[in-house]
Amino acid sequence: MKLTLWTYEGPPHVGAMRVATGMTGMHYVLHAPQGDTYADLLFTMIERRGKRPPVSYTTFQARDLGSDTAELFQSACRDAYERFQPQAIMVGSSCTAELIQDDTGGLADALSLPVPVVHLELPSYQRKENFGADESFLQICRKLARPMERTEKVSCNLLGPTALGFRHRDDILEVTRLLEGMGIAVNAVAPMGASPADIARLGAAHFNVLLYPETGESAARWAEKTLKQPYTKTVPIGVGATRDFVAEVAALAGVAPVADDSRLRQPWWSASVDSTYLTGKRVFLFGDATHVIAAARVARDEMGFEVVGMGCYNREFARPMRAAAKGYGLEALVTDDYLEVEEAIQALAPELILGTQMERHIAKRLGIPCAVISAPVHVQDFPARYSPQMGFEGANVLFDTWIHPLTMGLEEHLLTMFREDFEFHDEAGPSHHGGKAVPASAPRADEAAEALPLTGAETAEGGSIPPEAVPPAEAAEAPAGEIVWLTDAERELKKIPFFVRGKARRNTEKFAAEKGLTRISLETLYEAKAHYAR
């Protein structure tokens, strides 16, 4: 564990909370101090759930550590059962309570409650949130699911969706419609929306559809071995992946690979004349491995972007992430340190970032367009509208979401042609984003002076004054070690397209520092350009 201002994943017990909150008839008793009781905030404020999560806490305090914390936990279990009457109970410890080393599973079993008790042993100091959700769902399946006779009609289970997941609610509906269009029934969706009784009948399905490997793959592998149910390997995000998914499901179910794509608009929108400005846009992707790998395929193959960087924060999926990155000629960035991600983005200077809530903050700071493709996300990415990521409608949503932050093609030409215009200048940003118009900056005093008619003496020198001869206002004595841009160099820098201007500025300043220069002139800018072009 480490101290940080931001984390992509919480501790494992947060993953267990996501599983319990997504289910019905399940209650989670968490051995935790008062400081770990933040489930209500996560699910009611961020996800906007209309009811409190089914989580009870022991809420022990410092003074309780000298007494019997085991009795405190048993009282919490007993009270939770009597008050909520769940069909099953999950028990476990938070990262802080793990240090006490109370046997929560044994203590709960000693109560002889009349409902199944699922024991969770989540290593808080080695693993994180997605592992916690994956392991919790696996233990629930092991405790409750059993082999049974298959349904008469071909059916499947949808595995992996949880509470606080990125668009899980809408993905379930979209994939269900896709499967029903193929004549395949959905036996159960788990853990989100499932009760312990639904988990018990998972074995009735003919196969499983794994929607989110981060939170459902362990259960899918267990079901394949124990319940003899194969599971899908393709995540249907994007047009190509959805068609591959349909073919894979058809092979497992023994049906024709047909799907209704009448609502699909993304391919034509991507190929239409007003979308040609997408081609070649440099994009950086970061998030959970499943969404990043799928989004990279959509970005390159379906929208014509150039993928210049990709990575994930969940180390459990480092191997498939690195394998996918090789297909793009890249080395994957696998880290849970947002500062490393920001450093990579600065070095690559992409034109679009596809990431999490953290990448949205980074993009805002760097002035780069951004769209969110993966958890963790904030409240605005739990929309009231229907907005899936999967299936054909999900492909439409991806197009709209990713294109919206970009400057339109015609507007890019206007920025190039009228760079100093009062309306179409670089600082204004894309006009379709609303807000208020940003007026162009007033010319500086030295720039205004240069615009005045030249005197005879100036004409004799070729009509220009070298910056070194008459230093501009901002080129006055700079603090020691600080690099200052001269007017002519600053003006030339503005002629560089805005999406690579930041990188050009950084490279030039690095070049100047290496050469021991404190003032960057036009010549310095050209020398730096030649240096990095080698």
From Swiss-Prot:
Residue positions binding [4Fe-4S] cluster = D36
| EC number annotated for this UniProt entry | 1.3.7.7
Pathway assigned in UniProt: Porphyrin-containing compound metabolism; bacteriochlorophyll biosynthesis (light-independent)
Keywords, sorted A to Z: 4Fe-4S, ATP-binding, Bacteriochlorophyll biosynthesis, Chlorophyll biosynthesis, Iron, Iron-sulfur, Metal-binding, Nucleotide-binding, Oxidoreductase, Photosynthesis
Kindly list the cofactors needed.
[4Fe-4S] cluster
Please name the catalytic residues of this protein. D274
- Transmembrane annotation, as ranges: none
- Sites binding substrate sit at G409, L410
Indicate the enzyme's highest-level EC class: oxidoreductase
Cofactor comment text = Binds 1 [4Fe-4S] cluster per heterodimer. The cluster is bound at the heterodimer interface by residues from both subunits.
Gene Ontology terms: biological process: light-independent bacteriochlorophyll biosynthetic process; photosynthesis, dark reaction
Gene Ontology molecular function, alphabetical: 4 iron, 4 sulfur cluster binding; ATP binding; metal ion binding; oxidoreductase activity, acting on iron-sulfur proteins as donors; oxidoreductase activity, acting on the CH-CH group of donors, iron-sulfur protein as acceptor
The similarity comment for this entry is: Belongs to the ChlB/BchB/BchZ family.
Name of this chain's protein: Light-independent protochlorophyllide reductase subunit B
Question: What organism does the record attribute this protein to?
Answer: Cereibacter sphaeroides (strain ATCC 17029 / ATH 2.4.9) (Rhodobacter sphaeroides)
User: What are the top taxonomic ranks of the organism?
Assistant: Bacteria, Pseudomonadati, Pseudomonadota, Alphaproteobacteria, Rhodobacterales
